[in-house]
């Protein structure tokens, strides 16, 4: 999944103050909520960093392994799925 696509959908989730579910290899799911979480994408490394403000912990995910990102908009789920 491209870093640009990841940024677009996570920016939209942030703008709408909604959750984003990030699925990694169909086994692991990260729920980035509107409160207490932040993220950044390192384009040059193709890595997504998820930051939990409460625990002050960072999780790094190679964007190659992200299989899907889903956000909720007006009671509908919208997904970005890796081809």
For the regions a protein language model found, what residue spans apply to each?
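Acidic, low-complexity, intrinsically disordered interaction modules
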Residues: 24-69
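Short glycine-rich, low-complexity segments
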Residues: 1-28, 72-83
């Amino acid at each position: 999944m491209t870093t640009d696509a990841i940024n677009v959908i996570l920016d939209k989730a942030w703008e709408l103050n909604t959750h984003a579910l990030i699925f990694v290899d169909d086994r692991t799911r990260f729920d980035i909520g509107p409160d207490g979480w932040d993220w950044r994408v390192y384009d040059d490394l193709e890595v997504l960093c998820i930051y939990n403000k409460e625990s002050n912990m960072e999780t790094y995910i190679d964007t190659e392994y992200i299989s899907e990102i889903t956000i909720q908009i007006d009671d509908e789920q919208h997904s970005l799925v890796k081809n």
